[in-house]
Amino acid sequence: PEHMVKSYYDLGQMAGLNVVALDYIGNAMLQLIKTQTNQNTTTMVIQLGSESTVLNIVQGDNLLLQRTVPYGTNSVVNVVMDDKGVDATTAMTLLQNDRLITVDFDDNEVTGAFRYLINNIGRVMDFYASKNPDKPIEDVFLTGDGALIRGIDGLFKVQLNVSTRIMDTLYNIKFDPSIDLKVYNPVYLVTPIGAAFDPMGFALADAGTQTTKSEGSIAPFVALVAIAAIGAAGMAFYSINKKNTVTEICRQDI
């Protein structure tokens, strides 16, 4: 919808960014994933968000399945918040720095909070396997906010019974030396970098010809801004206060 597209252009303007293109998270992820996986290997890339998780199963350039699971890391963060008496930011920092999770749901409450998420991912994998018995999933890549939780790769490996690694290095992607990759870890940048490769191209009607790569429902999607200097996407973070204000405006628009 026009008002939704406009809200993201407004977001970019308020953040002092030049909006080059808009994309949705599914397409953006796919564009980068295709450059990171083996041509003959079937790979599932799991983007762990706070409220939902996006699954992409690919083989070479072919997208075999894409699904969104309505669970994210919020349930885990909430358990740590309650247990430690801290805010959400501190809880996530603890999850990233301390080994709070194990490989067994029954070991502790924090690990158990992953149960619904991983079980739902398992159901998607079972569905995929029933439709593609000749193309079994051979490995899993973890990306997104939750990928840096310490020990999460081991948990997913054991529970999903498939080789799992964190997508914290990107092949053939060169970052500007001024970017601190300890702060702007590649797991946070998969979608903005992918959007620069081949975005859908949602445009404002009054900003020129409105074009998209394909027709169809825009549906509820998470749009992202691809800026001109997309290689330095992580540097364009703005102040917390301004971000909160802009986010609230977008929520009201949507």
Residue ranges and their predicted role:
Residues 211, 252-253:
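Positively charged, low-complexity intrinsically disordered regions
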Residues 1-242:
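Hydrophobic/aromatic-enriched cytosolic interaction surfaces used to assemble or bind macromolecules
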Residues 241-252:
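Ser/Thr/Pro/Gly-rich low-complexity linker/stalk segments immediately outside membranes or between
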